[in-house]
């Protein structure tokens, strides 16, 4: 991902304030609510029968945290996202058969959740930088697909 020094600084500064547990669960939960067809990848997560069930599901929250911890790794390696996400790309492609379009959807949901959490601090410039990052991460995760 090609970010200016200013964009990198904005992304890093905001990310330092992110509560990964809370934001991860909320982002994944919202993905499952807004795009219900993504639920098929989470059969083992138990009750996903309603928005309330999804948003309060401990497995959704735990996996959301895991996703954002991986995203944090990506932020530390913006110059090598494909390398950083190579194993996860392989797993999601070869074993889990996740549609790579879902990575873009989750990235966009994450941007919305960050905007919701940070309000005025999430300026248009910060949003633009995060859109570049989530697009880069989605691209890296889709890399192993043929």
From Swiss-Prot:
PTM-bearing positions, type Phosphoserine: 44
Boundaries of every Globin domain copy: 2-146
Modified residues (N6-acetyllysine): 59, 82, 144
S-nitrosocysteine carried by residues: 93
GO molecular function list: haptoglobin binding; heme binding; hemoglobin alpha binding; metal ion binding; organic acid binding; oxygen binding; oxygen carrier activity; peroxidase activity
Annotated positions binding heme b: 63, 92
Family annotation (CDD domains): Hb-beta-like
Any one of the GO BP annotations: hydrogen peroxide catabolic process
Coiled coil location: none
Phosphothreonine modification, residue list: 12
Tissue: Red blood cells.
Keyword Amino-acid biosynthesis: no
Entry keywords, A to Z: Acetylation, Heme, Iron, Metal-binding, Oxygen transport, Phosphoprotein, S-nitrosylation, Transport
Entry-annotated residues carrying N-acetylvaline: 1
Residues passing through the membrane, by range: none
Cross-referenced InterPro entries: Globin, Globin-like_sf, Globin/Proto, Hemoglobin_b, Hemoglobin_oxygen_transport
GO CC annotations on file: blood microparticle; haptoglobin-hemoglobin complex; hemoglobin complex
Subunit architecture: Heterotetramer of two alpha chains and two beta chains.
Function of the protein: Involved in oxygen transport from the lung to the various peripheral tissues.
Family: Belongs to the globin family.
Annotated protein name in UniProt: Hemoglobin subunit beta
Organism: Leptonychotes weddellii (Weddell seal)
């Amino acid at each position: 991902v090609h970010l200016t020094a200013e964009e990198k600084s904005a992304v890093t500064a905001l990310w330092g304030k992110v509560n990964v547990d809370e934001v991860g669960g909320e982002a994944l939960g919202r993905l499952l609510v807004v795009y219900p067809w993504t639920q098929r990848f989470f059969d083992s997560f138990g009750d996903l029968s309603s928005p309330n069930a999804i948003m309060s599901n401990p497995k959704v929250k735990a996996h959301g945290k895991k996703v954002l911890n991986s995203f944090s790794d990506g932020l530390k390696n913006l110059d090598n996202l494909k390398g950083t996400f190579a194993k996860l790309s392989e797993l999601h492609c070869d074993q889990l058969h996740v549609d790579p379009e879902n990575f873009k959807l989750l990235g966009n949901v994450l941007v919305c959740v960050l905007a919701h959490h940070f309000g005025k601090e999430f300026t248009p410039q910060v949003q633009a930088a995060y859109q570049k990052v989530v697009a880069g991460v989605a691209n890296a995760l889709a890399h192993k697909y043929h």
